[in-house]
Regions:
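Short His-centered aromatic/hydrophobic patch
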Residues: 82
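N-terminal glycine-/charge-rich "phosphate-binding" loop or analogous flexible N-terminal tail
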Residues: 1-75
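A short helix->loop->beta-strand "cap" motif at the edges of active sites that frequently abuts
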Residues: 93-98, 117-119
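ADP-ribose/adenylate-binding Rossmann-like module
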Residues: 96-108
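A short, aliphatic-rich alpha-helical micro-motif
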Residues: 69-72, 90-93, 173
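Structural motif
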Residues: 76-77, 98
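Phosphate-binding beta-alpha-beta segment of Rossmann-like dinucleotide-binding domains, i.e.
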Residues: 117, 125-177
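Rossmann-fold NAD(P)-binding glycine/threonine-rich loop
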Residues: 107-119
């Protein structure tokens, strides 16, 4: 079984993460992993523009990499993160049994074409759960302690010495019940 991994050469994360678990993936029915770099986004001057266009228009505006088109012909699984998965790619993958998006969204995959061709598409919806939880707790602490307001005041040359958010006595007592 062949898994084609199309990775972003500018992002070491995807490739390093896969390399770290490659030995586990190899245990799956003699899975052969083939890595191909996706250079489509490098044609754009700004990767941010690429991502915005992908979110608005989907992947059909890109031209798949020739090496991807060659390697997908006999691939059973397509794994990707930022690479656009077009109808042409899906149709070229005559043996494709699964498209795995290593991200939380679907925007860079032509899911409609995959469905028409009977190829399941899965993603990682919980991929960002931990960082989102971290940010939520951090924002709650910032709000409870008035950190952003205090920062804004200091940057404006002000310092409110009567700031209840930084009064440790108030902070310690504010949640107590009598």
């Amino acid at each position: 079984m062949k898994a084609l991994v199309v990775y972003d050469p500018k992002s070491k994360f995807t490739l390093e993460a896969l390399k770290a678990v490659e030995y586990k993936l190899a245990e799956l029915e003699n899975l052969e992993l083939v890595y191909v770099a996706d250079h489509n986004h490098e044609r754009m001057e700004n990767p941010k523009e690429y991502n915005l266009k992908m979110e608005k228009e989907g992947p059909e505006w890109i031209t798949p990499e020739p090496e991807v088109m060659e390697q997908i012909k006999d691939a059973d699984i397509l794994m990707t993160s930022f690479c656009g998965v077009t109808r042409a790619m899906l149709e070229a993958g005559k043996n494709l049994k699964l498209v795995f998006m290593m991200r939380s969204g679907w925007e860079n995959c032509n899911v409609k074409a995959a469905k028409e061709l009977g190829i399941p598409v899965c993603n990682c919806p919980s991929r960002l759960a931990e960082p989102v939880a971290d940010l939520t707790v951090a924002m709650m602490i910032c709000e409870c302690r008035g950190i952003l307001r205090g920062n804004r005041d200091i940057l404006n040359g002000e310092w409110n010495q009567n700031d209840i958010y930084n009064d440790t006595t108030n902070a310690a007592l504010c949640n107590l019940r009598i």
